């Protein structure tokens, strides 16, 4: 299930908030497997919940599709709107997913994790390489012009490496 995939991707707590009745909310929550749910929730209650979770030190992602989700989308650390939802929700959200499915959120999480790995790896390489150039220059092993050439070459190489696609080929066709 998508909820299980979100958990495996690092989401610690998944809460459903809905304006629907208790009975409807309970049935949906049980079927999809969220950690907790709240029914008959007003828009300001959603935003208040987001603010309370942030005050506890949690990072909060809010996913919504309607006008009533807009205050919470705005209050969240990251707001995600569904493209078929209300225009105001899409405008307020940080991210808009194209499908009415949480599978896109799982893909976004994996992409963001892969991107951060790439950024940190590139950073470590650049720092190490430049430190090596400085040490070789101080030791008199390479000339300043050679150091500049190697530095610029490494910058170009890292830039080209950074432009490679993170998405698997089958995902690229869908995106």
Task: Tell what function each PLM region has.
Residues 1-121, 173-175:
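Conserved ATP-binding TGD loop and adjacent catalytic N/P-domain core of P-type ATPases
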Residues 93-175:
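Membrane-embedded transport module
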């Amino acid at each position: 299930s998508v909820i299980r995939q979100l958990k495996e991707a690092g989401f610690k707590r998944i809460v459903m908030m809905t304006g629907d009745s208790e009975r409807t909310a309970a049935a949906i929550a049980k079927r999809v497997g969220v950690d907790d749910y709240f029914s008959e929730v007003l828009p300001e209650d959603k935003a208040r919940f987001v603010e309370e979770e942030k005050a506890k030190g949690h990072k909060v992602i809010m996913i919504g599709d309607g006008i009533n989700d807009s205050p919470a989308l705005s209050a969240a650390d990251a707001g995600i709107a569904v493209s078929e939802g209300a225009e105001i929700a899409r405008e307020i959200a940080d991210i808009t997913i194209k499908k009415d499915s949480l599978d896109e959120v799982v893909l976004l999480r994996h992409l963001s994790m892969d991107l951060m790995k790439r950024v940190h790896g590139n950073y470590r390489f650049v720092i190490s390489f430049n430190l090596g150039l400085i040490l070789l220059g101080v030791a008199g092993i390479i000339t300043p012009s050679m150091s500049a050439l190697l530095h610029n070459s490494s910058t170009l190489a890292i830039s080209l490496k950074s432009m490679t696609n993170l998405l698997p080929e089958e995902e690229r066709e869908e995106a």
